[in-house]
């Protein structure tokens, strides 16, 4: 064969890319495309090379073009689509990745496309659909990836023992894979088998997945509320893997919660100084500083990031919202234009574009962006939350159908569980148990709490009889709330009505008088959200300004004319249920009293018996 033979040139370029010689691969495929510019294998390989070079936009364009060109066998077309799906998922485009993985499976039954689709669905908090996708795999074709994903999907739907059983039935060949042991450690921890979980994870510390093992061991210690040992694992992690973004972020977050409000982000700053090109570390720093209330420092970090990466959509979009919130409309518009030019198909960018438009009073643009978001992700809570704001700002009464608290929210005063004389007596005992868990000094850097503490509760592994009684107590009111939903396939809350539900998250929040509050927020990964009041200070019971009450409808952005639409007065034993896309907040309240609550998110289950 001549060296000008396209097949030989393609093989040479493939070989160079596999060997990590991206420069040679790029030059080879460029010569090949001069000879055959519309040959699908060459176009697709050029996309893979562009991905290796870090040019994700060009990589996507080339991969999509290779799918559009004629003459590709169905099995090869499936592989091309699978590669594009992996690119989109890794770049943060889950909705687009889902569509492309499904395109791959329409072309041919490709196990890696099926596992890629399942992983994407799990990341979008759609475990029931992920289970359906995984169960369609022919036995033995998915390998350890399918086994681990199936276990994770079962765990997310509340089938904890079934998730464990999947792993115990794994083949002998799977036992040599670290992904198996990481999954096993997580499943054992969720079942409360902490000693066995640690035994599964510790051997991984000497292998190539030591960073993942340290994160898993940290999660295990946090599950046990052993904060100091969790801190030890994270500090060891950043010592060995200083450029690992998740380890650095987790360490900063835990140090903040343990009371280090001054130096918690120093580790990230040091790594950015050493490696200015680390975009992910810069983004993590911006997020941490913003959630710590250090807005000016966060803005400075974002501007430095944009200077390092001119035109970067993420830094630009964040800065656009920051400028909009601080009455700098011209800068906000310039930043969001940059972000939209770079990533018009990214949900995060469209969300910030909607916010900037709302603050600026550009209501038609806000309606356009929010329509795009809800069309793209019909179950996306952020899109619907912003949509309701846009409709309200436009004076469109359709917002009431979606988010009027009188239609979609409910509060109920619960009866005590069996064995308790009154709801007050039950909550006094429950409050004592919860207080014992609130041993941190500050709020997490990823939630809405400010000047308070928030501690996770894990229904699946919870052994405290009072908390088990709480979960039993809320089962009926949740079921009644779901049963009361009318059939409406177009409604973001009602369309997901199912005969069963699962608790997808649960936590307790402690606020003290003076400064403790919740900033207005939604729950992006929920369906039904909640607040249950365990202890309520006298100062807020009849407060004239409703300080300390749960408010609905007021956004966290300065949008003209949009104030709270309703309030729930806290009372011991009262449960509030509402859509996860409903904006809600708690203002600070006077005095020194304690406001202690439990909150949870519920997600629908397509089939099964449901419950916590």
Predicted regions and their residues:
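Start-of-helix register in tetratricopeptide repeats
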Residues: 7, 41, 75-79, 112, ...
């Amino acid at each position: 064969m001549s060296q000008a033979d396209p097949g030989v040139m393609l093989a040479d370029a493939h070989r160079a890319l596999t060997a990590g010689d991206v420069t040679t691969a790029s030059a080879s495929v460029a010569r090949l495309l001069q000879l055959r510019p519309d040959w699908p294998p060459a176009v697709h390989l050029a996309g893979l090379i562009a991905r290796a070079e870090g040019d994700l936009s060009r990589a996507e364009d080339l991969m999509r073009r290779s799918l559009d060109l004629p003459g590709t066998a169905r099995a090869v077309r499936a592989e091309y689509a699978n590669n594009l799906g992996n690119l989109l998922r890794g770049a943060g485009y889950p909705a687009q990745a889902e569509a492309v993985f499904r395109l791959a499976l329409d072309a041919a039954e490709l196990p890696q496309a099926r596992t890629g689709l399942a992983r994407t669905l799990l990341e979008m908090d759609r475990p029931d659909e992920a289970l359906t996708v995984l169960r369609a795999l022919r036995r033995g074709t998915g390998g350890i990836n399918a086994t681990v994903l199936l276990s994770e999907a079962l765990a997310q739907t509340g089938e904890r023992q079934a998730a464990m059983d999947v792993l115990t039935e794994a083949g002998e060949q799977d036992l040599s894979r670290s992904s198996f042991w990481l999954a096993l450690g997580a499943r054992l921890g969720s079942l409360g088998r902490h000693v066995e979980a640690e035994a599964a994870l510790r051997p991984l510390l000497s292998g190539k997945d030591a960073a993942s093992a340290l994160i898993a061991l940290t999660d295990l210690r946090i599950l046990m509320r052993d904060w100091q040992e969790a801190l030890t694992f994270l500090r060891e992690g950043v010592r060995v893997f200083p450029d690992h973004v998740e380890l650095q972020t987790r360490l900063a977050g835990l140090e903040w919660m343990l009371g280090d409000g001054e130096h918690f982000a120093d580790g990230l700053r040091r790594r950015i100084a050493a490696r200015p090109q680390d975009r992910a570390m810069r983004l993590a720093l911006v997020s941490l500083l913003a959630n710590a209330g250090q807005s000016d420092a966060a803005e400075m970090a974002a501007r430095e990031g944009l200077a390092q990466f001119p035109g970067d959509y993420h830094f630009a979009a964040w800065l656009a919202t920051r400028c909009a919130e601080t009455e700098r409309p011209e800068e906000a518009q310039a930043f969001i234009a940059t972000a939209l030019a770079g990533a018009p198909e990214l949900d995060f960018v469209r969300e910030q574009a909607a916010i900037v438009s709302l603050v600026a009073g550009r209501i038609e643009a806000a309606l356009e962006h929010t329509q795009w978001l809800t069309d793209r992700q019909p179950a996306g809570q952020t899109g619907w939350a912003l949509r309701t704001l846009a409709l309200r700002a436009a004076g469109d009464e359709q917002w009431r159908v979606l988010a009027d608290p009188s239609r979609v929210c409910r509060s109920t005063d619960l009866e005590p569980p069996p064995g308790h004389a009154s709801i007050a007596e039950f909550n006094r005992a429950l409050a004592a148990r919860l207080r014992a868990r609130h041993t941190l000094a500050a709020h997490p850097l990823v939630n809405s709490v400010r000047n308070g503490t928030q501690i996770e509760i894990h229904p699946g592994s919870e052994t405290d009889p009072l908390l088990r009684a709480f979960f039993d107590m809320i089962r009926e009111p949740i079921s009644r709330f779901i049963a009361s939903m009318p059939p409406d396939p177009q409604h973001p809350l009602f369309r997901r009505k199912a005969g069963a539900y699962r608790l997808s998250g649960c936590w307790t929040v402690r606020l003290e008088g003076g400064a403790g509050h919740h900033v207005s927020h939604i729950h992006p990964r929920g369906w039904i959200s909640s607040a249950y009041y365990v202890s309520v200070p006298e100062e807020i019971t009849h407060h004239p300004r409703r300080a300390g009450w749960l408010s609905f409808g007021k956004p966290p952005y300065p949008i003209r004319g949009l104030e709270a639409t309703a309030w729930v007065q806290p009372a011991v034993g009262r449960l509030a249920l509402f859509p996860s896309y409903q904006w809600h907040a708690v203002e600070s309240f006077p005095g020194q009293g304690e406001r202690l609550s439990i909150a949870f998110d519920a997600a629908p289950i397509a089939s099964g018996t449901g419950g916590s």
